[in-house]
């Protein structure tokens, strides 16, 4: 089983990036992208030892790490500042994310996500370099 991730890419489209932006330059010290595990059901035991279970509503959380000051980071900064509430106005952008893994013929598509977190500026690390930038998206829809 080959688990090589080399060649994976992420494409993001939104009002801030209407033509879409494909990220292929992964940082050296963070995961290029992560999709958090989610709880989809809850199981309990009733008084007479019978199983009681139900489905849980949940959201998907995708974190993308980028190299600071790269073209990818500069484009994501545009999206960050577009989506950050300023004054009395909020721009809640609908973001479409496509993740293409090496060896897969079709990408994983995530629709109507929202950029919920990002770094507004660089952070200097003690080893003399800038920290990688992380951008976090949340939503509920995966298109199959």
Regions found by a protein language model. Give the residues of each.
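Short alpha-helical interface elements
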Residues: 37, 88-89, 140
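Charged, amphipathic alpha-helical segments
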Residues: 60-86
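Short, acidic/charged, Gly/Pro-enriched secondary-structure junctions
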Residues: 78-108
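Generic recognition of well-ordered secondary-structure surfaces with a strong bias
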Residues: 64, 97-99, 137
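Residue-level signal for secondary-structure boundary sites
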Residues: 72-74, 105, 143
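C-terminal or internal capping secondary-structure element at the end of a domain, subdomain, or sheet
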Residues: 131-144
């Amino acid at each position: 089983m080959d688990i090589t991730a080399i060649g994976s890419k992420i494409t993001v489209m939104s009002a801030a990036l209407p033509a879409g932006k494909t990220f292929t330059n992964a940082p050296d010290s963070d995961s290029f992208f992560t999709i958090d595990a989610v709880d989809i059901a809850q199981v309990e035991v009733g008084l007479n030892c019978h199983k009681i279970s139900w489905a849980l509503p949940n959201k998907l959380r995708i974190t993308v790490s980028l190299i600071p000051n790269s073209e990818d980071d500069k484009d994501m900064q545009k999206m960050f500042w577009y989506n950050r509430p300023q004054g009395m106005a909020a721009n809640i952008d609908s973001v479409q994310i496509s993740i293409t893994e090496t060896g897969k013929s079709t990408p994983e598509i995530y629709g109507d996500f929202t950029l919920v977190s990002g770094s507004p500026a660089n952070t200097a690390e003690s080893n003399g370099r800038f920290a990688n930038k992380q951008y976090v998206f949340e939503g509920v829809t995966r298109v199959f």
